[in-house]
Amino acid sequence: YISINVGAFISTILTPWLLEWYGPHLAFGIPGILMAIATYVFWLGRKKFIHIQPKGMGFIRETFSREGLRTMTKLAIIFSFVAVFWALFDQTGSSWVLQAEDLNRNWLGVHWLPSQIQAINPIMIVIMVPIFAFGIYPVLDKVFPLTPLRKVSIGLFVMVIGFAMVSVVQQWVDQGQQPSIGWQIFAYAILTSSEVMVSITCLEFAYTQAPRSMKSVIMALFLMSVALGNFFTAGVNSFIQVPNQLVAATSLNMTIQAKDKNGKKLLSTQEDILKLTSQTKDINGNSIQYITNQEGSYTLILAGKDGTFGTTTDIRLKFSKGGKQIAVKTAEKTNLNTAFVKIKSYFDSNKNTLPKTQAGTDLIKSIIDNWGSPLQYRLVNRNMFRITSLGADKNYMTENDIVLVSTISRPSKDESTKKKPYSWRENRIIELKGDEGKREVVKSRGGIKEIEFDTAIMVGGQTNLEGSDYFWFFTW
């Protein structure tokens, strides 16, 4: 287990760095080559490893015997609780990384990439395994008999403490603060302690408690708990997604701009495009209108909730002749802009600090949308906020919400960051977007003279469990 985590530490440090500076070819190619070498080394030992010959139907008889079924049932009950552990633990590669993007990642004199923080877990495993084996376990065993089940039980409670820690950190982020990454590393220490007590103990327990011919099956049951935990997390994340009304139009636009291998558009005539748009349905089951503009651009119109064109629920997406999205227009444009001005005025008057969610909501609550509901405000982090019209259904967090998302770019005082060479990712952005991409890269580095606000309009497309609420949900 220590050997596995030594490899995990090295790969978790190097892979994000290779991806950032040399691209996916090396970042994923090198691990692929190393896996091939590992397979070859394993093959070289084929004459030294112990080979257990298949026993035919004896395996079936023992597996489905009274003892075999009793063993699997007992372990399945234990592993069902362990599945909850994996539902939380494996989020270190997803929600924890996203949280790290909003934290101050300068730690130990190094500016860490968000994905590199995961390397803390395997290196802590290497340190903590001997500490637990030769220090903590013997001490606890003097207080009460420390059985494998008690180790697992204690580990599950410790996991709750670790996830509560990142929940608190996310609360700070939700309030516009930028906590140190050290807080998340502290949570990693708690999480790793839980892993030592749960994962290692379960691996040992599964092997020692299984009948000789069933060891692989019992190990598979343990690994099934990992899958179940991830299925649960995936199910929650799927359930909390709010449908995005703009997807139908943006997907249609990609089809309109599609070209064959010779660079010729597949839809070459106006009739072809009109036929396609009339057959394409939005999430409400309505067709999409296509209108050409004088300057060569075109507009795709979604009818919205009422299914009728020419009403306040219409959503207009304007695209350039080359297919670049220029604007999203809705009936809420004026209201959202008015609210945006109020939030920006507060920002300018309060030392470049955004209002917290409740303060911002109070600031714009007098602005009423076209359907009689006050606008809503949410602070996402210190550099992002959302202003929302509830839309025609008057319900928050639905596909009819019309949302202005604003992102703040701030000048950086660190001159070395501005002058360092472009990474592979930054060069790729510039290659794909040209001058616009270069501007995007410079802005992300803080190479601008003054604070800038970028805004985008979305219709739906949010998540109805976010921020600290998301982390507290899994904690409880």
Residue ranges and their predicted role:
Residues 2-3, 147, 154, 179, ...:
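Cytoplasmic loop-to-transmembrane helix junctions
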Residues 2-6, 119, 123, 157, ...:
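Transmembrane alpha-helical cores of Major Facilitator Superfamily
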Residues 5-21, 164-168, 228-240:
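A gly/Pro-rich, aromatic-decorated transmembrane alpha-helix motif that marks the paired
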